[in-house]
């Protein structure tokens, strides 16, 4: 009865470690029969020992041997599966218990105990593998020294004996000693395993039976020799773990720092590359022949300097082919090349000067733009000499050319001072050149500043007369504007008026007075509309008193008859240069609308006013200014798209809108609005995290 009372106690210990078969509780005869069955299982031991002999060197080699043994638990003994769940609190007692069992075996109470002991070692080695797995979990991140790893793999053999002792029920004396030692060792192991307790729960154990069997067959002599080393190795591992945790941030930080430094330094390197010339000995070459191709220009420049025995390392041609950079190998060659300034290259006198850094170029460009005017609506056949005759005080005239070298109808006029440029703009605005009225504007920042002042609000001495009757004459306008010093009425190629005029006054105050007193006055049956002539008007800013607000030279015509041809459409608008009708791709029939192009925005405006409520081929047409490319609203509306007020899309769904990057109607940015979020469900089901702003 004493033994039966002891047995439940041991069974409780076993529940803590590994649930044994229930046969243990019955009687001493059943225990002996269990031992006989276990001795029957011992037939498999000799082949296992052969495997062990082959794998033993790998066990002591390094950590990988340990890792190979880790998955053993599942495959060998199903009853041991539950061993992974207890904390290390129950693992630490293993060394001393192994000693007790070893002694019991050597005393030789009966022959069957010696036979069953080797099977017990199979089980305890399985559990020892779990112990090693706990340690390998701890050791995975830090690099563990080879010596402690080898020690551990050798010393771990006797571990986990307590799970086997209660299952086999050896003797009363051993059980009592085990119980006492367990109580003592539990207290000691708690302190040792406190930090690493959760390790076994983290990793599932895959089934690999072969390495487990090989590792499980270690000898009894190793059990006794390595008892003490087990505890020492645990201390070593804890120290290694603490050191590796301290070292880990230090190791990672330099890598991150290098990456960040590389990212930061990359833009700086690019900046340096673009801001400085490719060579320290570089010359800027102007007045090249734009009609030649890039390769011809490079070859000609190299030959030009090569004749003077000047070595050129590189030639870079600008996009307009009117200028470029020439790099030399030495400062001496660069100085000699400067002496060739004014010499002819491909029939033109080239201008040479030292290349400047980007900073100085920006400063020079600001100053240069302030005294340079941009002129458009020029005849395509105009020459630089003709433009110099118009602008007598011009320092330089540069025509804007296309790739073929022909004029685009635009030019830059540079003056000596900013005052001369301002004077020329006031005097020459609207002046005709070969039947075309010039449109003059400032360049660079000054142009932007003028346009921001608002159309018509900038004080100017010149007024533009819109909606002018074709029957009106300069004398009629002179009678109305008695203080006017100059009146210009642009005409088309046939000599007919274009429907607008420029009226210049002695002072800006006179022009302002005329605008206030004569606006909407009727001339030849039409009410004229007046506004100041300014760059703002050219750019299409809305005047407080009216005027078009689109910078467009194209009219959009709706309501066309199916019989209207492009030729008929073009002839219906005075001053038009081309017309096109939009047709159906499949049938080729007209869709009822088209576009009419003009040479300037003012021509388009005059034609629009002349044809307002007009008819073409019996159909009443509706006119509007065609929007330039890029000025359409991008997306927006229900269903997403690009646009909207709060994010990157419409008012629901898609990629944002009023509710951020996906759905909702809240007024939010990229994180969603009141009903936004990062999903896209529109007003129905906004997905993702809801973010509310209070």
Curated annotation (Swiss-Prot):
SMART domains: RRM, RRM_1. Residues 26-40, 116-142, 171-194, 218-246 have a biased composition (Acidic residues). Keywords: DNA-binding, Methylation, Nucleus, Phosphoprotein, Repeat, RNA-binding. It comes from the Eukaryota. InterPro entries: Euk_RNA-bind_prot (IPR050502), Nucleolin_RRM1 (IPR034230), Nucleolin_RRM3 (IPR034234), Nucleolin_RRM4 (IPR034235), Nucleotide-bd_a/b_plait_sf (IPR012677), RBD_domain_sf (IPR035979), RRM_dom (IPR000504), RRM_dom_euk (IPR003954). PANTHER family: OS02G0815200 PROTEIN, RRM DOMAIN-CONTAINING PROTEIN. It is found in: Nucleus, Nucleolus. Residues 633-680 have a biased composition (Gly residues). Residues 1-277, 631-694 are annotated as: Disordered. This is Nucleolin. Residues 281-357, 371-445, 461-535, 553-628 form the RRM domain. One of its GO terms (biological process) is positive regulation of mRNA splicing, via spliceosome. The modification Phosphoserine is found at residues 116, 136, 171. Sequence repeats lie at residues 55-61, 62-68, 69-75, 76-82, 84-90. CDD domains: RRM1_NCL, RRM3_NCL, RRM4_NCL. Residues 46-108, 143-168, 196-213 have a biased composition (Low complexity). One of its GO terms (molecular function) is RNA binding. Highly phosphorylated during mitosis. One of its GO terms (cellular component) is nucleolus. Nucleolin is the major nucleolar protein of growing eukaryotic cells. It is found associated with intranucleolar chromatin and pre-ribosomal particles. It induces chromatin decondensation by binding to histone H1. It is thought to play a role in pre-rRNA transcription and ribosome assembly.
């Amino acid at each position: 009865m004493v033994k039966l009372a002891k047995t439940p106690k041991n069974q409780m210990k076993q529940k803590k470690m590994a649930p044994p078969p229930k046969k243990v509780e019955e009687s001493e005869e059943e225990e002996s029969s269990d031992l006989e069955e276990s001795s029957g299982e011992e037939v498999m031991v000799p082949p296992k020992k052969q495997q062990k002999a082959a794998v033993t060197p790998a066990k002591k080699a390094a950590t990988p041997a340990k890792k190979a043994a880790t998955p053993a638990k599942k495959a060998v003994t199903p009853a041991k599966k539950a061993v992974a769940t207890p904390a290390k609190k129950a693992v630490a007692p293993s060394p001393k218990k192994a000693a007790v069992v070893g002694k019991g075996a050597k005393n030789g109470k009966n022959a069957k105990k010696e036979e069953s002991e080797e099977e017990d070692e199979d089980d305890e080695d399985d559990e020892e593998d779990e112990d090693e797995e706990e340690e390998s979990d701890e050791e995975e991140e830090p690099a563990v020294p080879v010596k402690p790893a080898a020690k551990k793999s050798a010393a771990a053999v006797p571990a986990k004996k307590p799970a086997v002792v209660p299952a086999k029920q050896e003797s009363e004396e051993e059980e009592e000693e085990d119980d006492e030692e367990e109580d003592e060792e539990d207290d000691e192991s708690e302190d040792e395993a406190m930090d690493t307790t959760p390790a076994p729960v983290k990793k599932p154990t895959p089934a690999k039976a072969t390495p487990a069997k090989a590792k499980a067959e270690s000898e009894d002599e190793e059990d006794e020799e390595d008892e003490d080393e087990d505890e020492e190795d645990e201390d070593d591992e804890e120290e290694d773990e603490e050191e590796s945790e301290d070292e880990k941030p230090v190791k990672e930080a330099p890598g991150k720092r290098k990456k960040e430094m590389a990212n930061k330094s990359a833009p700086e390197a690019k900046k340096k590359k673009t801001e400085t010339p490719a060579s320290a000995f570089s010359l800027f070459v102007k007045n090249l022949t734009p009609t030649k191709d890039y390769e011809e220009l490079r070859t000609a420049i190299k030959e030009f300097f090569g004749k003077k025995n000047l070595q050129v390392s590189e030639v870079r041609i600008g996009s307009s082919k009117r200028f470029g950079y020439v790099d030399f190998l030495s400062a001496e060659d660069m100085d000699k090349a400067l002496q060739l300034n004014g010499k002819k290259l491909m029939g033109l006198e080239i201008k040479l000067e030292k290349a400047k850094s980007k900073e100085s170029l920006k400063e020079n460009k600001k100053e240069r733009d302030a005294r340079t005017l941009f002129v458009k609506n020029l005849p395509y056949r105009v020459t630089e000499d003709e433009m110099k005759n118009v602008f007598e005080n011009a320092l330089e005239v540069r025509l804007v050319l296309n790739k073929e070298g022909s004029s685009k109808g635009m030019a830059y006029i540079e003056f000596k001072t900013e005052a001369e440029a301002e004077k020329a703009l006031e005097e020459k605005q609207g002046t005709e050149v070969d039947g075309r009225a010039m449109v003059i504007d400032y360049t660079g920042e000054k142009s932007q500043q003028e346009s921001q002042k608002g159309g018509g609000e900038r004080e100017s001495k010149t007024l533009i007369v819109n909606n002018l009757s074709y029957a009106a004459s300069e004398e009629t306008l002179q009678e109305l504007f008695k203080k006017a010093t100059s009146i210009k009425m642009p005409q088309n190629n046939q000599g007919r008026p274009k429907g607008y005029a420029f009226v210049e006054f002695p002072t800006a105050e006179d022009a302002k007075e005329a605008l206030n007193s004569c606006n909407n006055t009727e001339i030849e049956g039409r009410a004229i509309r007046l506004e100041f002539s300014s760059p703002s008007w050219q750019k299409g800013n809305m005047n407080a008193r009216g005027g078009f607000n689109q910078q467009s030279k194209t009219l959009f015509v709706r309501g066309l008859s199916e019989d209207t041809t492009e030729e008929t459409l073009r002839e219906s608008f005075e001053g038009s240069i081309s017309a096109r009708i939009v047709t159906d791709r499949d049938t080729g029939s007209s869709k009822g609308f088209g576009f009419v192009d003009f040479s300037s925005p003012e021509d388009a405006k005059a034609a629009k006013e002349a044809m307002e409520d007009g008819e073409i081929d019996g159909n009443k047409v509706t006119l509007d200014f065609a929007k330039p490319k890029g000025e359409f609203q991008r997306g927006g509306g229900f269903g997403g798209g690009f646009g909207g007020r709060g994010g990157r899309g419409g008012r629901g769904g898609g990629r944002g809108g009023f509710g951020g990057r996906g759905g909702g109607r809240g007024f939010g940015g990229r994180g969603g609005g009141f009903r936004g979020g990062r999903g896209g469900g529109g007003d129905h089901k906004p997905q993702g995290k809801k973010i509310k702003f209070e």
